[in-house]
């Protein structure tokens, strides 16, 4: 699953990665001259957890993936574990494999997952159960037991939010000192892969009566609940296959308006490169 770094690839492109600020420039190279700052993710080792949009085997060499562009531009070493069709209940398995194969050498982890939970009509569910319990407390007087309502995260693979709770709990425990970044699912349109695999566009609800928006919102909420930064790929990539003119970013206007093509993956990579400027890759 390792994708070996190619030092020297994309050097010409790297020299073009200069962002003019008031007094400084962004440098996409290992060593930077005075007046330049280095991208915080330059040269880092990053694990990628996800589905077909991340999977190197999805369309093979026909699509250059976003993480491959980041390898070229920022010399990121990618450890790619995304598998086509996988849902949030596969996050623990992918995380365990990353831990086993790369342990402490990985600097950061990026998770792009959720679109298949929507397509498979996994119920959204709720984040917590609540019940009254007694707890010791004091506010300027002698401490005493008080009855208060307490919430406990729901850990179940039967719901989307339960799966996210399990997955993020697992990631936090396996990689307590590593940067973890969540990406919201992209917009989606018609995908027709055969008689037994036809996925309507996002204007339709899934079988449990939810629009894809609920699954996007779930990732945003999870960031606050678990203390994990979220990049809203659903909006900031600017890609929407429901707009005919934007199908230039998707694989095939006839049967696959779901998967970004190389142009779409490059736009994703550009977006991610700039968004990651605000986040440290390691601590």
Task: Please identify what each model-predicted range represents.
Residues 21-84, 92-104, 109, 244-245:
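Serine-esterase "nucleophile elbow" of acetyl-processing enzymes
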Residues 87:
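Contiguous, function-dense segments enriched for cysteine-driven chemistry
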């Amino acid at each position: 699953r390792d994708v070996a770094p190619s030092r020297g690839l994309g050097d010409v492109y790297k020299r073009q990665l200069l962002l003019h600020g008031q007094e400084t420039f962004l440098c996409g190279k290992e060593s930077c001259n005075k007046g330049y700052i280095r991208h915080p993710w330059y040269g880092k080792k990053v694990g990628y957890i996800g589905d077909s949009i991340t999977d190197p085997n999805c369309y093979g060499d026909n699509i250059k993936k976003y993480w491959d562009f980041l390898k070229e531009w920022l010399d990121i070493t990618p450890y790619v574990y995304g598998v086509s069709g996988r849902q949030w209940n596969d996050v623990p398995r992918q995380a365990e494999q990353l831990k086993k194969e790369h342990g402490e050498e990985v600097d950061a982890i990026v998770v792009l997952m959720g679109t298949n939970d929507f397509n498979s009509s996994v119920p959204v569910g709720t984040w917590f159960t609540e019940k009254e319990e007694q707890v010791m407390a004091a506010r300027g007087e002698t401490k005493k037991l008080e009855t208060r309502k307490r919430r406990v995260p729901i850990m179940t693979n039967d719901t989307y939010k339960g799966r996210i709770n399990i997955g993020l709990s697992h990631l936090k425990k396996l990689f307590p000192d590593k940067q973890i970044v969540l990406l919201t699912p992209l917009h989606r349109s018609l995908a027709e892969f055969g008689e037994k695999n036809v996925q309507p566009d996002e204007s339709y609800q899934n079988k449990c009566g939810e629009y894809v928006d609920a699954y996007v919102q779930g990732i945003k909420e999870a960031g606050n609940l678990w203390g994990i930064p979220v990049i809203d790929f659903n909006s900031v990539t600017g890609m929407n296959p429901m707009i005919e003119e934007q199908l230039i970013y998707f694989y095939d206007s006839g049967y696959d308006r779901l998967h970004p093509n190389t142009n779409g993956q490059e736009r994703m990579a550009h977006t991610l490169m700039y968004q990651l400027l605000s986040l440290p890759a390691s601590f």
